[in-house]
Regions:
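Sec-dependent N-terminal signal peptides
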Residues: 4-14
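Short S/T/G/P-rich N-terminal loop/turn motif that feeds into the first structured element of a domain
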Residues: 17-249
Length: 249
């Protein structure tokens, strides 16, 4: 994926309306943002808990109401690019940009001191997406932890968005999946590197046990054959999986 800077420029389209035409406001779009981090020599559970608490205090003091939640993702398989990913959920691009401007001007220096030796963020690997929910969970997961898997997929020759929609419809009609499972597709708000995915798929489960159970149900349907026929996903059929902890709600 193409590297982007932390602060993205927001463009506003202003249209002229006649006095007889009512003004219409665009509906804010929810966003999700991923920031790669590497662990430092002083990284441990106690220090991570400390920096999470400090970060939440800073966000509270900023009155950053546009942030609707935050998570930390830890990869199931070691990755050279990151040791953990800090995830932020936003209710709009405008609100996100306001919070980042405030953070950069008033909080970043203190944050850098707080995390020194514990972890460091990578401003060359900050990725913003627009999520679209494909299926909501049957029940809200309030445990504070979950697992998820990302798939970066392209359409095979002769297939396209209509086939993805058809696949989603069939998947959503399968009975027996765990109550906390849900999924979204993610639209990158940056220019991905080649090969560019046609869509990014993200599955979320309440636990590893739920994931294993759901994958067993999935394997007994005709859907795996559809996936192989219609889509090619990277890095492979297993995707990229994480343990996740909610750090702000």
């Amino acid at each position: 994926m193409k590297k982007i800077t932390l602060l993205l420029t927001t463009f506003f389209l202003v249209s002229a309306c006649s006095q007889n035409e009512p003004e219409t406001e665009s509906v804010p779009t929810a966003l999700v943002e991923y920031v790669w981090h590497k662990q430092g020599p002083n990284f441990n559970p106690e220090n991570l808990k400390m920096v999470i608490g400090s970060w939440n205090t800073m966000i509270d003091e900023m009155q950053c109401s546009s942030m609707t939640g935050a998570n930390i993702l830890t990869p199931k398989v070691e990755n050279d690019g990151y040791d953990l990913i800090w995830v932020m959920l936003w209710d709009s691009q405008y609100g996100r940009d306001e919070c980042w401007d405030d953070w950069t001007e008033n909080q970043q220096l203190n944050w850098d001191k707080t995390i020194k030796g514990i972890m460091e963020y990578d401003l060359n690997n900050v990725y913003l997406f627009k999520p679209t929910v494909g299926k909501n969970p049957n029940e809200e997961n309030t445990s504070g932890s979950f697992v998820n898997t990302f798939y970066f997929c392209r359409y095979n020759d002769g297939y396209g968005a209509a086939d993805l929609k058809s696949y989603q419809t069939e998947l959503n009609n399968v009975e027996g999946f765990s109550d906390y499972w849900w999924y979204v597709t993610l639209e990158p708000l940056f220019e991905p590197e080649e090969p560019k995915p046609d869509f990014v798929w993200l599955d979320l489960w309440g636990s590893d046990a739920d994931k294993i159970s759901d994958q067993e149900i999935f394997s007994k349907t005709n859907l795996p054959d559809q996936v192989n026929k219609k889509f090619s996903c990277l890095p492979d059929i297993n995707g990229v999986s994480f343990n996740a902890t909610a750090i702000r709600r």
